[in-house]
Structure formats: C-alpha cells, structure tokens
Amino acid sequence: MSLTDTIRNTFVPIHREGYPFIAGFFVVSLILGWLWDPLFWIGMVLTVWCIYFYRDPERVTPMDDDLVISPADGKVSFVGLAVPPAELDLGYEPMTRVSVFMNVFSVHINRSPVRGKIDKVVHRPGKFLNAELDKASTENERNSVLIESPHGKIGVVQIAGLVARRIVCWSNQDDELSVGERFGLIRFGSRVDVYLPSDATVRVAVGQTAIAGETVLADYGTERGEPVVRIA
C-alpha cells in the first residue's frame, strides 16, 4: 500500500473545492506567525476548521431505482406538499417536498438523490434569510436542478441562508448522475429541497437526522411496510 493510500484510508477525504481555501489559511498562518508566534496557532486552528469544513467522507449508497436518497447531511426540517420553483417547469400543482437543513457542522457536499439525466440547472439570485424559514424556498438565492429519473422528473434545490452565501454546482445540463454521486456543495450549511411526484412514499419525519448518499427519504416500492409520513 502506498503512502497516499495509507493517508486516504486513515483520514477523512477532503474535497478538492477546499484545497485553495485550506492552502490560503495555512499561508496566512505562516505570515501571522512570522509577525507574532501566538497568531500562528490561531491561524492553524482556523486551518484545521477549514479542513473539517471541506471533509468528504465516503458513503454506502443503496443502489435501487425505487429509492430516493438524501442529497444532504442534516436535519429533516419539512415534509409536506409545496409548489416547486417556477424555473423547474414542474407545473403549479403541489408536489411532495422533503427539506434537509444543513448547519455549519454538517458535511457540505451535496449528492444526487436518484439516478438520472439532468434536464436543466438554473441559478436564481435572492435574499439570504434563515434557511429554516419556509419562505426561504422562494425568496432566497437558490440553484435548482431538474433530474429525469426512472420514476419521472424530480427537483433538487440548493438554497442559500444567513451564513451560506455561496452555492456550488459542478454538474450541468445533460450530465448523467448516479444515485449518491456528488453534484455540488453549499458553503457554511443551509438547505436542500427535494420535490417528488405524488406517488412517492416518504420514509422520514421532521426532526430526523439525514445522511447524504445513505438515508432513504422516499421510495416508489409497494412492499416496504407503512410509510413514516403520509402526504395527503
């Protein structure tokens, strides 16, 4: 086993998006330390925090087209019916929406909840309200991704918040995504909304902890027991 493999297997991986910021914090730490020794250690604490912020642990994703997997780490903050953002072109009828709120300590990498092809990616500028507020879905800055999945179109919306003011999405229209594949991140937390067809059965409840790429939010199967939440 090589040294690189040993490091990779011993420590939590860091996403490449974080490399410039980690390097920047480290260089600033060296400069501050040259001016005054205690400042070096303060800078190193911030560098370690930056490393923690951009951690990107591997996940074991269920490979089942009947499942919808959480796109984000965090807490389920909403389960119910809601009209999807207009830019997704999903119509004006309410759809099942599951929202996952990410705090500043969550893993910030976002993963595709389903396998499918991206129909469109639309970025909308907006406000930076508390992402836990319901109106943040329509008023805050957001990035909307429409995916054509084996069970139809679903919407995945990355929403900025009070602290999170930088949404990153490196996937583009016509890209093919695997379930659990990384497609973006939101710096300093915030929220991700998933809009599902009405025939999806929700398997999570408000307040439940979700793990990106692993937690089952909903499914289309008929033999998986009673749903956690019925959407009427």
From Swiss-Prot:
Its cofactor is pyruvate. The record marks 189-190 as: Cleavage (non-hydrolytic). It catalyses: a 1,2-diacyl-sn-glycero-3-phospho-L-serine + H(+) = a 1,2-diacyl-sn-glycero-3-phosphoethanolamine + CO2. Pathway: Phospholipid metabolism; phosphatidylethanolamine biosynthesis; phosphatidylethanolamine from CDP-diacylglycerol: step 2/2. It comes from the Bacteria. The keyword S-adenosyl-L-methionine does not apply. One of its GO terms (molecular function) is phosphatidylserine decarboxylase activity. Coiled coil: none annotated. The modification Pyruvic acid (Ser) is found at residue 190. It is found in: Cell membrane. It is a peripheral membrane protein. InterPro entries: PS_Dcarbxylase, PSD-A. One of its GO terms (cellular component) is plasma membrane. Binds 1 pyruvoyl group covalently per subunit. Catalyzes the formation of phosphatidylethanolamine (PtdEtn) from phosphatidylserine (PtdSer). Belongs to the phosphatidylserine decarboxylase family. PSD-A subfamily. Heterodimer of a large membrane-associated beta subunit and a small pyruvoyl-containing alpha subunit. This is Phosphatidylserine decarboxylase proenzyme. It comes from Brucella abortus (strain 2308). The lineage of its organism: Bacteria, Pseudomonadati, Pseudomonadota, Alphaproteobacteria, Hyphomicrobiales. The gene is psd.
